[in-house]
């Protein structure tokens, strides 16, 4: 180790050049940075940075190896475990999957009641379902919730004595759940009403939160922390509407690429939403949540789905179920960062159409 003693520093217009550099704690204060798809194999020194362009990961070199640096932001409305419930099957079973690992679904527990065509949303730790039709086609004003980390049956923690809804859609930003549209009767009374639930630990009741730009049912929704989007629906054109979690109402902003008939399944991350577009049984569209721009094509599902459910971990979306040719148990997945067609994920425990899904930890 060397000792450097400085008595006087004078401004002579040129910098002092230390031939062997300066080390602080064994590392140079001047660090190299490399962005590449493969790890730098030579010339690495403690403190050097490498950005892995192929996997969007960041590393720093210490003790003869690159160590990953991660900053994991809290995810308030998605997570590692996806849960699918409801649907037209006469079964109370809730299915769950680990979204990062392809495979068949497993029994999570039982729903609080048997309903299809309800809405689903997540605050990151709990999943919520509201509304729907029972086997007698009676529209419900009740809902239920589960805790993602604990397998078991759902409990009744959400509802609205003034509004029964089926074939609506839901989303959540941790603080609030937004429910839009749907029908108050079986195939009748399609509405443009928006309901808002304040997320609390106990029972949650809805309050009126304005109206959408059009009546809708069978539509899909996704959101970031401040803004939510609704995607089309049977009783509308291929429109995209936007609303705020803190200001009532939602209005038209853009268009889907397809006809938007009953997209039902949408998910994404904190920047982008991907929705089943409704043009065929396979078309997927994508939008940037904060932009007022028309959707663009993302790709195709690998199997025909119609009225699927969706869940996401922020990197991958799994679409499940549907009714293209009878009730389906297929699941397909896409990677949010990469446009293209989906891949087979596995099977639900039961075939179901109009199932709804959400995810959390």
Locate each region found by the language model.
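Polar, enzyme-active/binding microenvironments
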Residues: 2-361
């Amino acid at each position: 180790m060397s000792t450097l003693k400085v008595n006087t520093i004078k401004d002579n217009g040129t910098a002092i050049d230390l031939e062997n550099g300066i080390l602080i704690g064994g590392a140079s204060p001047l660090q190299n940075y490399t962005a590449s798809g493969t790890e730098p194999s030579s010339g690495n020194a403690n403190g050097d940075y490498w950005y892995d362009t192929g996997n969007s990961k960041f590393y720093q070199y210490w003790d003869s190896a690159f160590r990953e640096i991660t900053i994991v932001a809290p995810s308030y409305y998605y997570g590692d475990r996806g849960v699918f419930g409801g649907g037209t099957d006469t079964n109370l079973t809730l299915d769950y999957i680990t979204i990062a690992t392809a495979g068949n679904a497993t029994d999570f527990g039982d729903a609080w009641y048997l309903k299809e065509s309800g809405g689903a949303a997540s605050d990151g730790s709990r999943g919520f379902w509201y509304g729907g039709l029972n086997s007698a086609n009676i529209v419900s004003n009740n809902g239920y919730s589960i805790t993602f980390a604990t397998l078991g049956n759902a409990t009744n923690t959400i509802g609205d004595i003034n509004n029964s809804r089926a074939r609506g859609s839901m989303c959540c930003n941790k603080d609030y759940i937004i429910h839009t549209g749907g029908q108050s009767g079986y195939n009748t009374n399609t509405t443009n009403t928006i309901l808002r639930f304040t997320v609390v630990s106990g029972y949650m009741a809805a309050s009126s939160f304005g109206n959408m730009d059009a009546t809708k049912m069978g539509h899909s929704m996704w959101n970031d922390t401040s803004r939510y989007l609704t995607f089309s629906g049977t009783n509308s054109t291929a429109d995209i509407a936007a609303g705020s979690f803190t200001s009532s109402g939602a209005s038209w902003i853009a268009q889907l690429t397809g006809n938007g008939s009953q997209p039902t399944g949408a998910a994404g991350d904190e920047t982008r939403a991907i929705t089943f577009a409704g043009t065929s049984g396979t078309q997927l569209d994508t939008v940037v949540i904060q932009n007022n721009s028309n959707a663009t094509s993302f790709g195709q599902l690998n199997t025909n789905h119609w009225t699927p459910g969706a869940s996401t971990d922020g990197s991958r979306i799994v679409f499940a179920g549907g009714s293209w040719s009878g009730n389906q148990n297929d699941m397909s997945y896409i990677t949010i960062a990469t446009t293209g067609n989906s891949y087979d994920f596995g099977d639900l425990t039961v075939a179901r159409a109009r199932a709804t899904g959400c995810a959390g930890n």
